[in-house]
């Protein structure tokens, strides 16, 4: 494991004028907060960095863009996403985590569905985003019922397409994360069949392109500090945070507040426990022949604040 920090480069290399390109998604609450307030633009200006923002529908396309050089930093993605990117050869640095929020993703069915337990998903069409945390949650839930991914019919859909399919009844279940989970509960009366408790901790990972992490440790340190402050504010001011966030993602404030209650928003540096779980996730996907090759998480660089 390589610790990536700022000490190896002279100051002028770290403060040279450049643009930090950040990818995020609707579940990236803290980055959306920083974006809406232009917090990073102000904090990074003394370091010579401006900021550009790019929105994605889910985590895997975000990390693919990071890997091919179109982004420098990824907002939080679910715990299953990095192993997929690493299996594809991505040169990514583990940057930070949000501590576990296992109830912030779940397998849901319609309220009138006869399905009451995971074993009844056998042979059913189930919607989820490939490579998302939802994918791993489904894998673990099925395994607990003596099933595998081969026992169901996967419907790899974006959250918007999956919501439409769920409401039409063209899928029997949907595996989804907040805030989409809270939205379908409140707006479509979806019933939780199983959440992540005891199956998937649902840590959320921030990642950086390794070349960027090697050259711009001071910028990453400043972003990290702002993420921590943003997380503390959201948890300390839940109603205000929901009122602010809701119009930015097209939801009502009570739905956003319900979603935020299930997330910790506690930002930390990447620790051994989170990397160990990353390896377990990679091995679980590998055992089902879902990944093209074995992933060794310990081979990936880890950013350390210096």
Stretches with model-predicted labels:
Residues 31, 101-107, 190-191, 202-206, ...:
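Small-molecule pocket liners
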Residues 111-119, 147-149, 211-220:
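Short helix-loop capping/hinge motifs at secondary-structure junctions, enriched
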Residues 214-292:
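Secondary-structure end/capping motifs
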Residues 1-14:
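N-terminal export signals
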